[in-house]
Amino acid sequence: MTSTLVDTNVLIDIIANPDPASWSVQTLRNCAEAGELVINTVIWSEISGAYPVEPKPEVLFRGLILKIENLPVDAGYPAGAAHVAYRRAGGLRERTLPDFLIGAHAVVRGFSLMTR
């Protein structure tokens, strides 16, 4: 069984356009058939912060079963190191640390990462 960490942008796609034919819905369905779908507290904060009151995940995602994990401590260093390397190499985007935290979470837990 393969667990998949689902990135924020995919969830935003599904909330905005739940069309079963969309790439995000189709790919998420395939990942769900292969194993567990996971988000972390960084992803949940990026999604839920847009609402005036914290939504319930099962309502927001229309019954989609997502396991919510805390960010593993051992993801911190590789995320920070990758972020620093990105900036030193001339990376122009400044607010990328959450992306590196999400990616490092997938790596240290051995998850696939679904993003676009």
Regions found by a protein language model. Name each.
Residues 1-39, 49-60:
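Short, well-structured N-terminal submotif of metal-dependent ribonuclease cores
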Residues 46-47, 65:
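Helix-loop "lid/cap" segments that line or gate small-molecule binding pockets
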Residues 8, 41, 98-100:
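Conserved glycosyltransferase catalytic-site signature
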Residues 10, 43-46, 75:
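Short, well-ordered alpha-helical scaffold segment located
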Residues 67-116:
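Active-site neighborhoods of divalent-metal-dependent phosphate/nucleic-acid chemistry enzymes
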Residues 52-74:
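Active-site-proximal, substrate-binding regions of enzyme catalytic domains
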Residues 14-18, 46, 89-93:
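Short, flexible loop segments at the rims of nucleotide/cofactor-binding pockets, characterized by
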